[in-house]
Amino acid sequence: KHDAIAQKLAKMAAQTFAIEAMVRYTSSLVDLDKKNDIRIEAAMAKLWGTERGWDIVDDTMQIRGGRGYETAQSLEARGEPGIPVERMMRDCRINTIFEGSTEIMRLFIAREALDPHLKIGGPVLNTTLPTEVRLKAAVQAAGRYALWYPRLWIPFLTCGSDDVARPFRREARRIRNDSRRLARRLFHAMLRHGPKLDKKQVLLGRFVDAGAELYAQTACLAWAGELIKKGEAGDAARLVETVKHFCQLSQATVKELFREVGRNSDSGGYQLARKLIHD
């Protein structure tokens, strides 16, 4: 009945579905071909899943209130359900640190995403190289990006595949267009910062987080569509509602991340931190 709690429950349900969808989707890539390179997909699933898993447990603690701090044994001794939220917090929080901390995972994904572009455009932006080397690299890069970059500005009016379940065609179109917007923003950042981009860890993190959100949306559409196709969706209407709600939440996050790429306080925060440390 209370809107504040209801919104938390809806978000928790949607994100729980998305976490499982990402795991299933990533695993299916290996099932299709054992030689598939899923480093980026697996890293995104780990990064996004552990972050959202912690958010879910944190919201659970907020909902449970003081009872969340009690052990299951203490709750049961008082005649209440033994929900071990305090244990969930201990077990879940460490996941954002072990097997690749959140910060390391973001840098790894960013490096993998940038590597193909840096191989092409890196020499052009590297002022330490001889002029003739940079000019030759510029000609090669121009030929590559003359076709690639303009396509990023073409809006897509279709979902891109007839395999996308009909209820999710609109969400699929948004994912395609946001993916191209992400590629444009990342390319612009490369041109602006050049080789120094790898030092902009927080900026790169925003690109990675946006990509992870889009991957989560894609996984949700794929898994939900498969469940509907096989008749294993159970309450299909609720499944569609859950997926659409998740995509709305995720799209809002992507929009905010794109805004922060252009408007942020990163430089001021970095300078302040240096002064605090030196003091």
Residue ranges and their predicted role:
Residues 1-279:
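Flavin-dependent oxidoreductase catalytic core characteristic
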